[in-house]
């Protein structure tokens, strides 16, 4: 029988080989917390000591929560989804991910929720990447002045409160005054730029619906689709029945999608409809998290809520690609009170405001823009020169008209100059009326406003102003096409162009018929001939001589 011998070297080599080849596949470390309190879309979690601010936490059933309050031994989270199945004692796990949104051109033409998930039933979206929602806005040195116009197609805005690429222009007014309509028309007006195929002209749009009814959001989608504008628009929807957390993060998701295009050297337009509901959702979240309330029960950082959002709108420097993000935030007022807390906050953040007044809306002035309280701090630097040359007189005439209109309400006798000013102002107000979904190209706007401010419409009855404008602009396009071409190519209203417009107005007035069937310009009646200038033929008359019998 052979003796079994094991050498120590063999044992050592075997152990070393086993240790070197060992791979730990099941060993790992995971932080697990537990739900302490839950309700009203809020959950308090104990444990998870290494959680980061704005980190996503995973609850039972895969529901996500956003860590907002990092307290000693406890975390206050906002549930981003259905919270009915979340109960006390359930486990909560860290994801290690900061709140972010997928971005890319695949989102154009789609409707998504505030987490970037499609909700339009058109399948999954292939994202080009993701972008964190809480990132620093561009610094001062990374920006350049706003100087390129962004045409909205709305005469009253493009003429008197011009918007430039990279600007933040507030749309403010009571409910049911046409705020959403103005924003949607601005999106629709980018259609021609999109179809041109020129990246320097194209503007990609994002519409963020916060706290809106689902039927209202459906109407917006239909309006954009019918106008051919959905192809370059992304809609981020947080309807009224969604949790407060979705309404809170929806604007940041929309801005993340738009910023992706801006940092790629492209141009984007974002509409926040409306930030009042986001502030109310943030107030509800803060009160449930027991943050100390301030004015109107809003938390102390509600200003920062909107400032860090709107500061992301910018015109980047050429070194960063020269992209731009233009913001149109919407704020809803109560009883036209623009001095309330949230309206004054956003007014101080933005670069101007368009104030829509309910009284004007009820009078049939659509869009119901109050030119006295509406302003653009960018001013004429964001206007083409042709528009700038005619818009200054328009604002002055309308301001004088409003002042005289209030004075004339007392029944005082007015001199002829005042009556003429009132008559022209009434025609200018009628000229600025514009139907929904029919934006005007800038060259047609310039011609229309030129005709109004130079008195060419003073002899046209107010009831016929809009029909005269429509037919006259079409007449110029047919008979004087060089007018529009000159404005588009040069951006100016030259003396030669004005001379052509003078001829066009005079010619068109001769063929325009009023609503009562009478011609606008009566042809002068032919004057009678001067008898002194008429040569008459003289015929000699031969009378027979009188007979002698007749003499007797």
Curated annotation (Swiss-Prot):
The keyword Ion transport applies. It is found in: Cell membrane. ATP binds at residues 173-180. It is an enzyme of class 7 (translocase). The record marks 374 as: Required for activity. InterPro entries: ATP_synth_asu-like_sf, ATP_synth_asu_C, ATP_synth_asu_C_sf, ATP_synth_F1_a_nt-bd_dom, ATP_synth_F1_asu, ATPase_a/bsu_AS, ATPase_F1/V1/A1_a/bsu_N, ATPase_F1/V1/A1_a/bsu_N_sf. It comes from the Bacteria. Residues 516-552 are annotated as: Disordered. It is a peripheral membrane protein. Its EC number is 7.1.2.2. It catalyses: ATP + H2O + 4 H(+)(in) = ADP + phosphate + 5 H(+)(out). GO terms for molecular function: ADP binding; ATP binding; proton-transporting ATP synthase activity, rotational mechanism. Its main location: membrane. Keywords: ATP synthesis, ATP-binding, Cell membrane, CF(1), Hydrogen ion transport, Ion transport, Membrane, Nucleotide-binding, Translocase, Transport. It holds the Pfam family ATP-synt_ab. One of its GO terms (cellular component) is plasma membrane. SUPFAM superfamilies: C-terminal domain of alpha and beta subunits of F1 ATP synthase, N-terminal domain of alpha and beta subunits of F1 ATP synthase, P-loop containing nucleoside triphosphate hydrolases. Produces ATP from ADP in the presence of a proton gradient across the membrane. The alpha chain is a regulatory subunit. Belongs to the ATPase alpha/beta chains family. F-type ATPases have 2 components, CF(1) - the catalytic core - and CF(0) - the membrane proton channel. CF(1) has five subunits: alpha(3), beta(3), gamma(1), delta(1), epsilon(1). CF(0) has three main subunits: a(1), b(2) and c(9-12). The alpha and beta chains form an alternating ring which encloses part of the gamma chain. CF(1) is attached to CF(0) by a central stalk formed by the gamma and epsilon chains, while a peripheral stalk is formed by the delta and b chains. HAMAP family: ATP_synth_alpha_bact. This is ATP synthase subunit alpha.
């Amino acid at each position: 029988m052979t003796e079994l011998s094991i050498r120590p070297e063999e044992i050592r080599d075997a152990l070393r080989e086993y240790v070197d080849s060992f791979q730990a596949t099941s060993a790992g470390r995971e932080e697990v917390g537990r739900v302490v309190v839950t309700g009203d879309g809020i959950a308090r979690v104990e444990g998870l000591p290494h959680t980061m601010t704005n980190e996503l936490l995973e609850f039972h059933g895969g529901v996500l929560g956003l860590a907002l309050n990092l307290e000693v031994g406890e975390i206050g989270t906002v549930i981003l989804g259905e919270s009915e199945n979340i109960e006390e004692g359930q486990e909560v796990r860290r994801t290690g991910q900061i709140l972010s949104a997928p971005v890319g051109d695949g989102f154009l033409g789609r409707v998504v929720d505030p987490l970037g998930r499609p909700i339009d039933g058109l399948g999954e979206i292939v994202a080009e990447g993701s972008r964190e929602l809480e990132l620093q806005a561009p610094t001062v040195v990374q920006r350049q002045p706003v100087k390129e116009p962004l045409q909205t197609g709305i005469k009253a805005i493009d003429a008197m409160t011009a918007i430039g690429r990279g600007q933040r222009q507030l749309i403010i007014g009571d409910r049911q005054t046409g705020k959403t309509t103005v924003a949607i028309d601005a999106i629709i007006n980018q259609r021609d730029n999109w179809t041109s195929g020129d990246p320097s002209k194209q503007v990609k749009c994002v519409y963020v619906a916060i706290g809106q009814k689902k039927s209202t959001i459906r109407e917006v989608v239909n309006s954009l689709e019918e106008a051919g504008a959905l192809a370059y628009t992304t809609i981020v929807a947080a309807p009224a029945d969604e949790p407060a957390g979705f309404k809170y993060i929806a604007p940041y998701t929309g801005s993340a999608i738009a910023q992706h295009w801006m940092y790629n050297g492209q141009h984007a337009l974002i509409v926040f409809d409306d930030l009042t509901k986001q502030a109310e959702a943030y107030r509800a979240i803060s009160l449930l998290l027991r943050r100390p309330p301030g004015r109107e029960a809003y938390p102390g950082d509600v200003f920062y809520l909107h400032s860090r959002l709107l500061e992301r709108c910018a015109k980047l420097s050429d070194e960063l690609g020269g992209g731009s993000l233009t913001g149109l935030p919407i704020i809803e007022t109560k009883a036209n009170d623009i001095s309330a807390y949230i309206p004054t906050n956003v007014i101080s953040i933005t670069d101007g405001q368009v104030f829509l007044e309910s009284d004007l809306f009820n009078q049939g002035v659509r869009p119901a823009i109050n030119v006295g309280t509406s302003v653009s701090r960018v001013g004429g630097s964001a206007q083409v020169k042709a528009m700038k040359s005619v818009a200054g007189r328009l604002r002055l005439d309308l301001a004088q008209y409003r002042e005289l209109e209030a004075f004339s309400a007392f029944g005082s006798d007015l001199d002829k100059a005042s009556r003429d000013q009132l008559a022209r102002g009434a025609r200018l107000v009628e000229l600025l009326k514009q139907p929904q979904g029919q934006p005007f190209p800038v060259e047609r706007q310039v011609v229309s406003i030129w005709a109004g401010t130079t008195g060419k419409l003073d002899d046209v009855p107010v009831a016929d102003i809009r029909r005269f404008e429509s037919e006259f602009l079409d007449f110029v396009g047919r008979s004087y096409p060089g007018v529009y071409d000159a404005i588009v190519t040069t951006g100016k209203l030259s003396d030669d162009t004005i001379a052509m417009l003078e001829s066009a107005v005079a010619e068109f007035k001769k063929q325009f018929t009023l609503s009562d069937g009478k011609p606008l310009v009566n042809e002068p009646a032919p004057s009678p001939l001067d008898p002194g200038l008429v040569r008459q033929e003289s015929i000699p008359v031969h009378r027979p001589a009188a007979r002698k019998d007749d003499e007797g």
